[in-house]
C-alpha cells in the first residue's frame, strides 16, 4: 500500500473584499503519495498558485481539511504553520529567491539554522555540502548568487529545498526564468530526484515538462478536471 504524504478534502479558498467575493478554489479533493511526481496545469487564474500556497502552508483554506502525514494543518496558527513548513516542506521558486548578500553555502544552510532542533556546525556542513554535491555545485559554495547564471541559481535553489530532507517538495514554474537548455537540465534533475524517492508537486505551464510527472492535475475555475487525452504512458491522469 502506498504511503500517503498529504490529503485534501473539500478545500475551498475565497478572497473577499467589500465589493465582491472571488472563489479561487472550489472543493479540492487530493491525495499525494510518497514518491509521487505531480504536475499542476491550467490557464492563468485557474487557482494553481492558490493551491500551491495552501499546500505549502503559505496560506490557509477558507474551508475543508488538509492533513500532512496525518496531521491536520488547515487551521494552524502562523507560528505552528511556519514550524511544519520548515520541517516537512521544501520550495523551489521561479525567481530562485536566493539572498544575494549571502554565499551559496549560507543560502543553503539558512533553513537548517532556523530548525526547532539545533544542529551542530559540523552536521550542517555535512548536509549542505551533500546537497551541493547532489546538484553538482559544490565548487560554487563560496560564491554569491549574483555571480551565477540562472541555471546555476536554480540548482542552488534545489539544493536549498532539499537540505531539510522534506516530505514534500513544492515546485513553482521552475523553468520560467530559464532558456530551454537550462530548463531541460533543471527538469532532468527534478526527475532524477523523483526517481531517487523525492515526492514532488510542480506547477508548470509547459506541457512538455508536465508530461514528465507521474500524475497530472488540470485546474479550471478552481476545480480539478481531467484532459481528454494524454500521450505519456508512464503518467496517470487524475479524474475528479
Give the location of each predicted region:
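ABC-family P-loop ATPase nucleotide-binding domain
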Residues: 1-14, 228-240
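ABC family nucleotide-binding domain
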Residues: 3-219
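H-loop (His-switch) and adjacent beta-strand-loop-beta switch element
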Residues: 216-229
